[in-house]
Amino acid sequence: MADKILEIRNLKKQFSTGFLLNIDYLYTNRNDIFTLIGPNGSGKSTLIYLINLLLSADSGSIVFDGEDILDKKNNQKKIREKMAVVFQEPILFNTSVYNNLLLGLRLRNIEFSEYKDNFNFLIEKLKLKNLLSRSPKTLSGGEQQKVCLARALLLNPKILLFDEPLANIDQETREEFRGDFFEILKQKGTTTFYITHDRNEAMIISDFVGVIENGTIEQIGPKEEVFRRPVNEKVAKFVGIETLISGIVNNMQNSVIEISVDGSNFIYAVGESIKGKRVMAAIRPEDVIIIAKSEETTSLSTLNIFKGKIKEIKDTGLFKKLEIDCGFSLAAYITDASINRLGLKIGSEIFAAVKASAIHVF
């Protein structure tokens, strides 16, 4: 059974604006990278501030490493010393990088010799050795965040809290930085509570993911489960599932659900449901296979083959995204090479195949 280092129950924080953070239950396993994702203004940063006691909660409990940090009978200063925070904006002081790195040690009256090996490890891994004598003002945004990360990790915190640390860094630096510091986190086994509005980042870095919307946790679980099996429409849309089709369960047989979309279109999915129930079928764009000719569909064993017409072709970077009218709107990813090979353009009539096992029903 996983060892939960952080458990939050019935946590509430009301603001004068009317916004209410209301967390029924949320947890983080020891040594995991947990990422909380949600739109701007959903309460992500507020939760970080509450965990680190930068804000006071109205009610509830935050049990960290066996102690309720909201219980003032506990030594809150000692509990906070087990944590470290890296914010969206780098917080550095007008002195050398070296002095900034040692700030935590000096505030705690700890001898540098106790952490010398860790210091050398971090400046080597994060490529800070040649920056130690410089002022933070002369560093790039990515370099400043690396200094903040090294300072946070120097004291080997029990948990590292990240408040969107890559939000203001360019894409190239973000990818380099992400690779460096998450390699270190995994190597050191540091429990990490990371917040972001970037779902792609969450998919890359996380072990577990939570989705927050309007101050409430909508879903929490292993990242594959959250991204592939969302519990509701809010989560589905936020994790990037654009094709959400409403229908009625028409039949159930051998764990295959037959869903009537409009009486003439049917969708087949693997799962369990109840006949007559209104459900939502979620189809991820990467699970759609595009076929140009009807005769090529005869060799397919998939239950779902939809005839449609391409309404739009959008460039998303690595892929093109097709918007297809199949009697319902269907999104699909496809490469430039496949578009050219199949001779596809706006107005092309095609067939879209989706395995029943790839369709999630809720």
Q: What role is predicted for each listed range?
A:
Residues I37-P39:
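The feature captures the beta-strand-to-loop junction immediately N-terminal to the Walker
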Residues G60-D71, I79, N118:
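Conserved ABC transporter NBD signature motif
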Residues S264-I313, Y333-F362:
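Glycine/charge-rich catalytic "coupling/switch" loops of P-loop NTPases
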Residues L154-K158:
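A short, proline-enriched helix->beta-strand linker immediately N-terminal to the Walker B motif
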Residues S113-L131, F182-E183:
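Conserved ABC ATPase "signature" region
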Residues S135-L139, E143:
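Conserved ABC ATPase signature
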